[in-house]
């Protein structure tokens, strides 16, 4: 064999060879493909496990066998690099959703090495199989392996956006990549929105993808950094540990760390904090303990008495990996080249891949369906002339002769003739003839559907959306990482992080609050709300997750609760008591609840108390940044209670009704705007031992429904009310009796929205229709509805 010797300069040879090497490690080793989010070794591991039947529904198999398969067929490198990649795919502190399930020691968050491959066992996770689904339907291209003995996929079908879900990290020649993991449900929702609107902005996408979602949890800060990374591919965020404070029996406090930043070595973190203690870099730490066990991660930092725990925590954030900065560098292989990509480009590349995958699969299924249709048509034709076919076959010399005769005499095709001669005798029954005709109809429908998908781009996109929704429904999980953005520090509107969604807000009279999806509400209906015995619905309305709920109590206080912080609970289930969200006193009860979309409004609230005080305050006064404690809405004096809170867009008439049957109607224009801590002015001039039972807005078309303790209901029209001035005594609405006089225990303004009433005693309740109560004159006591001897004395009434 003759040798060819080239005379080349060392500079040219080194440049050329290093260029080839760089291209190889960039494309074939260190960087993931944007379409399936996998590096070549990861793809080969998953494909080797799939093709050998090592799937989630089978038994675990020795890891060494998989490593051998990968090295022998696809990846001619050392076994350690393959095993390390395989182990990483099984580590739930590295991947948001593991792609391999592993039995045995697969390492730890302390960076302990895994057991040798001969000891551990593994199989594909259920989600990993979604990356490989339909790979046998010619959905992706295959190339020869390194020795041309078999084929391997260039990319996996990847039925979910794995690059964003599990992220990636790697270093190659001249390139590095750091893509954080995200929440699967959020990523899929953003992809669906992108399909619906390819011009969607990054800001709009961030309503669905709130930010990274690390498998180790933690707290993410820096929404500007997230937005910048999603726009350009590069950005910086802060990731800090979740730290809580506990008090020990001896009065000391300790900081408890339950979540640490992504890819931080826990044992190194504990060691670093202990070094800071030992070196007396920080004064006040007694001991650092790693209390992690099978129940979860836990690091305890015991503090000296009377030290400022907040200062120590801040010091540790600054001087240890209790807080780190994470730098986005979203580089991936796209069209065979490394590219720095924003989130829109990543989703777009993934979507184009899915369009190709679904189109290829549809073509494959269409081809198979058409081939089968051709066979079925031949079988049906043969069965229609069965006797002649049998006679022809019997007269033939052999199988080949029979096929040729069928083709020549009856014009069957080669494929149809083959199917006919292979037909078994038992298939000639009437049942199988009917089955073939049924299969023919099904194939016709399937072929029509598949052709529609191929001919109609929107139909193809709908298939992608349906399959993404299925995966979202099957594999969605709660977000692990909390995203915080303090307005003063980050300078960004927090609303960007809250997905805009219309929901149903509900509040019960006993203080149970929840938000419910409109779908759950519509499926159940108002009447099927989950309630405790004796409780009833106070209010429900459609709100947005970006709105704020103001909950007012009888103590004159209000709770400021962003809607998105309310628990998302099904309509038929019991809500969350407001005291679990914001602590309130035991004898504090909810009076009313209102939803605010924008506090920059001219609307105002009117507050009325039992002892006849009233106050007006504008809505902007109620905006706050404090969510963790009740705030003052109005000053309520001792031995008094707030009984009514109303919200008006402009001045209007209100009616006051008292226990002894007095009524005063006047306009809110008589009230001056006051601050939140003011007690207000006199609403009505009360008689001795009288008190207010109702203060509500009223208009000309309304009626008033009143209930007395003796079981009587009285309904009057608006015209009986006499508009007067504030602080007067008003008019009498009851006929005075010397013996056992009627006293009004409850009253409500009836509008067109109300149709039913409910009367309550201590042990009974009575329901009825408001329209059944006839309107009365001014000086009457109404009509008896219940017998108090049986029902008990009436103590309250609600309308709905």
Curated annotation (Swiss-Prot):
Question: Which EC number(s) are documented for this chain?
Answer: 5.6.2.2
Q: How does it sit in the membrane?
A: Peripheral membrane protein
- Top EC class, one word: isomerase
The record places the site described as Transition state stabilizer at 118
Q: Sorted alphabetically, which PROSITE patterns does this protein's record hold?
A: TOPO_IIA
Q: Which residues form a coiled coil?
A: none
Where is the Topo IIA-type catalytic domain positioned along the sequence? 31-495
Looking up InterPro entries in the UniProt record yields: GyrA/parC_rep, Gyrase/topoIV_suA_C, Topo_IIA-like_dom_sf, Topo_IIA_A/C_ab, Topo_IIA_A_a_sf, Topo_IIA_dom_A, TopoIV_A_Gpos, Type_II_DNA_Topoisomerases
On assembly, the entry states: Heterotetramer composed of ParC and ParE.
Q: What's this protein's name?
A: DNA topoisomerase 4 subunit A
Q: Which organism is it from?
A: Staphylococcus aureus (strain NCTC 8325 / PS 47)
């Amino acid at each position: 064999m003759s040798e060819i010797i080239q005379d080349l300069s060392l500079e040219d040879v080194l440049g050329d060879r290093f260029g080839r090497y760089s291209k190889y490690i960039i494309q074939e080793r260190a960087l993931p493909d944007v379409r399936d989010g996998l590096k070549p070794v990861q793809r080969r591991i998953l494909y080797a496990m799939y093709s050998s039947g090592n799937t989630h529904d089978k038994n675990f198999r020795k890891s060494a066998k998989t490593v051998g398969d990968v090295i022998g067929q696809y990846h001619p490198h050392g076994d350690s690099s393959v095993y390390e990649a395989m182990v990483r795919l099984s580590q739930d502190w590295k991947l948001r959703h593991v792609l391999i399930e592993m039995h045995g020691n697969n390492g730890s968050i302390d960076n302990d090495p895994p057991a040798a491959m001969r000891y551990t066992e593994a199989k594909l996770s259920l989600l990993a199989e979604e990356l490989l689904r339909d790979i046998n339907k010619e959905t992706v291209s295959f190339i020869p392996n390194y020795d041309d003995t078999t084929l391997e996929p260039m990319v996996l079908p990847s039925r979910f956006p794995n690059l964003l879900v599990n992220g990636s990290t790697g270093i190659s020649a001249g390139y590095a990549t750091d893509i954080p993991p995200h929440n699967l449900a959020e990523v899929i929702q953003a992809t669906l929105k992108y399909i619906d609107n390819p011009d969607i902005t990054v800001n709009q996408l961030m309503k669905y993808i709130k930010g990274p979602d690390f498998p180790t949890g933690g707290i993410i800060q820096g929404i500007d950094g997230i937005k910048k990374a999603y726009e350009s591919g590069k950005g910086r965020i802060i990731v800090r540990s979740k730290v809580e404070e506990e008090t020990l029996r001896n009065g000391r406090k300790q900081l408890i760390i339950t979540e640490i930043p992504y890819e931080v070595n826990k044992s190194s973190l504990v060691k670093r904090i202990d070094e800071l203690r030992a070196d007396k870099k920080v004064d006040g730490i007694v001991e650092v303990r790693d209390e992690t066990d099978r129940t979860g991660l836990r690091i305890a930092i015991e503090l000296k008495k009377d030290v400022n725990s907040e200062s120590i925590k801040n010091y540790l954030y600054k001087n240890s990996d209790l807080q780190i900065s994470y730098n986005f560098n979203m580089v991936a292989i796209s069209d065979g080249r490394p590219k720095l990509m924003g989130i829109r480009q990543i989703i777009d590349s993934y979507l184009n891949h899915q369009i190709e995958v679904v189109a290829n699969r549809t073509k494959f299924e269409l081809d198979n369906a058409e081939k089968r249709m051709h066979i079925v048509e031949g079988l049906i034709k043969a069965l229609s002339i069965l006797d002649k076919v049998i006679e022809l076959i019997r007269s033939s010399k052999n199988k080949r002769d029979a096929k040729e005769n069928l083709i020549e005499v009856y014009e069957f095709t080669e494929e149809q003739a083959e199917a006919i001669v292979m037909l078994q005798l038992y298939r000639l029954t009437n049942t199988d003839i009917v089955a073939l005709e049924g299969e023919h109809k099904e194939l016709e429908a399937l072929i029509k559907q598949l052709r529609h998908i191929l001919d109609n781009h929107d139909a193809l996109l709908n298939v992608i959306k349906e399959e993404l929704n299925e995966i979202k429904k099957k594999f969605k999980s709660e977000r692990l990482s909390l995203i915080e953005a303090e307005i003063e520090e980050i300078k960004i509107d927090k609303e960007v992080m809250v997905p805009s969604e219309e929901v149903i807000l509900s509040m019960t009279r006993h203080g149970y609050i929840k938000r419910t999806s409109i779908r759950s509400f519509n499926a159940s209906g108002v009447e099927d709300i989950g309630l405790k015995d004796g409780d009833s619905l106070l209010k429900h309305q459609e709100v947005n997750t970006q709105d704020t709920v103001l909950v007012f109590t009888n103590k004159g206080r209000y709770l400021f609760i962003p809607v998105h912080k309310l628990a998302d609970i099904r309509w038929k289930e019991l809500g969350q008591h407001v005291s679990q969200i914001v602590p309130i006193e035991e004898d504090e009860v909810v009076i009313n609840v209102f939803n605010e979309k924008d506090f920059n409004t001219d609307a105002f609230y009117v507050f009325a108390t039992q002892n006849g005080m009233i106050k007006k305050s504008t809505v902007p006064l109620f905006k706050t940044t404090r969510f963790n404690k009740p705030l003052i809405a109005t000053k309520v004096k001792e031995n008094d209670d707030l009984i009514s809170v109303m919200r008006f867009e402009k001045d209007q008439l209100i009616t006051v009704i008292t226990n002894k049957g007095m009524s005063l109607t006047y306009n809110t224009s008589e009230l001056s705007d006051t601050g939140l801590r003011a007690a207000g002015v006199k609403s009505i001039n009360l008689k001795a031992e009288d008190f207010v039972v109702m203060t509500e807005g009223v208009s000309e078309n309304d009626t008033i429904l009143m209930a007395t303790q003796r079981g009587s209901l009285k309904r009057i029209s608006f015209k009986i009310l006499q508009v007067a001035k504030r602080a007067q005594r008003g008019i009498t609405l009851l006929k005075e009796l010397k013996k056992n006089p009627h006293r009004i225990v409850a009253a409500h303004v009836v509008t067109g929205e109300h149709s039913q009433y409910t009367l309550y005693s201590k042990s009974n309740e009575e329901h009825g229709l408001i329209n059944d109560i006839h309107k009365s004159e001014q000086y009457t006591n109404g009509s008896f509805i219940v017998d108090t001897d049986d029902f008990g004395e009436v103590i309250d009434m609600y309308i709905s």
